[in-house]
Amino acid sequence: MNTASDIDYARYDHIRPILWTGDALQLLDQRKLPFVVEHVVCHDSDEVAAAIHALTVRGAPAIGIAAAWGVVLAARDVQAADGAHALQQLEPALQRLNASRPTAVNLAWALARMRRCLNAAGADWKAKLEAEAQAIAEEDLAANRHMGALGAGLIEAGSGVLTHCNTGSLATAGFGTALGVIRAGMAQHRIARVFAGETRPWLQGARLTVWELQQDGIDATLIADSAASHLMKTGAVQWVIVGADRICANGDTANKIGTYQLAIAARHHGVKFMVVAPSSTVDMETVDGSQIEIEQRDPGELYGVGGTRTVAEGIAAWNPVFDVTPGELIDAIVTERGVILNPTPENMRAAFGG
């Protein structure tokens, strides 16, 4: 049986995108990677919200963790007898944080958890609030390591895998979700080849994922997003492994734009499709993917690469950031609570209630 203790974390888990210093939040600026390693320092909640919206920090779990620390920063100048009274003053800041990225359910989940903490806290509410943010981060790291072992256990030795976007340490408290499974699979000699799609338009695969794997000494092969179907046809890939920003009650999964087409291609070519995400990403109140708000970003993000314009003036662009993969195209959903094979409303309820 695979366990998280089988993995050499000194080798496979040393990148940290979020650092709480005690009076400020340091965020590794993921817009500048891989060529510039630089941190943005946030001193208040509005700076955290701006960093989330600007993709300084990204990845659903990391967004939730950053938002939790944003609440701690917002509380610094608030004077209140207990947490419930403090919450009344903090609510505008929480709403601004919540509006920074609407699709990722982890953001709303983390803020709801901070609200519950405040409502239950007495005069020591500031200390309780900081401890809650720290707990969210620590629990995410532990969950990622456990998911890594669970997901790796599904993969046969010698397999090739394809991943999309960035789901590693940069997107979480550490180790990663889908990339955590890949790290665990490499450590246990189950995965022989790793392929990563470039992930237009922000190139999270090209800029972040292959860089992360390089830091761990894992060889990865970058492909154009449009090459994925042909890669599967060659037989080089046995699993597509992705993360999630929201998982619905029927297994429908919102993730980075381009995920849906990978799932369609995988099913056509007999390639297995795995979604890896913490249970905080599961939204049992959302019945199916049709109810998910899909974030639309500035069309200008499609007009160039690396600051160089590649498109003629006067061209329209459509730039949804996420798409929804139907649950029937997913072979396994892996959370820290366990593995759901071939997700349906029934086995999702059995795993998560609702």
From Swiss-Prot:
Positions annotated as active site in the UniProt record: D245 (proton donor)
- Note the site residues: Transition state stabilizer: C165
According to its UniProt record, the EC number is 5.3.1.23
One Pfam entry name: IF-2B
Presence of the UniProt keyword Isomerase in the record: yes
Q: What residues bind substrate, as annotated? A: R58, G59, A60, R101, Q204, N255, K256
The yes or no answer to whether the keyword Isomerase is present is yes
> What pathway does the annotation place this protein in?
Amino-acid biosynthesis; L-methionine biosynthesis via salvage pathway; L-methionine from S-methyl-5-thio-alpha-D-ribose 1-phosphate: step 1/6
Q: Which transformation does this protein catalyse, written as a reaction?
A: 5-(methylsulfanyl)-alpha-D-ribose 1-phosphate = 5-(methylsulfanyl)-D-ribulose 1-phosphate
Class of the enzyme per the UniProt entry, highest EC level:
isomerase
Give the molecular function GO annotations. Answer: S-methyl-5-thioribose-1-phosphate isomerase activity
Family annotation (InterPro entries): IF-2B-related, IF-M1Pi, IF_2B-like_C, Initiation_fac_2B_a/b/d, M1Pi_N, NagB/RpiA_transferase-like
Q: Which UniProt keywords apply?
A: Amino-acid biosynthesis, Isomerase, Methionine biosynthesis
Give the highest taxon in the source lineage. Bacteria
What's its job?
Answer: Catalyzes the interconversion of methylthioribose-1-phosphate (MTR-1-P) into methylthioribulose-1-phosphate (MTRu-1-P).
Query: What HAMAP family does this protein map onto?
Result: Salvage_MtnA (MF_01678)
Query: What is the name of the protein in this document?
Result: Methylthioribose-1-phosphate isomerase
Q: Which organism is it from?
A: Stenotrophomonas maltophilia (strain K279a)
Q: Where is the organism placed in the taxonomic lineage, from the top? A: Bacteria, Pseudomonadati, Pseudomonadota, Gammaproteobacteria, Lysobacterales
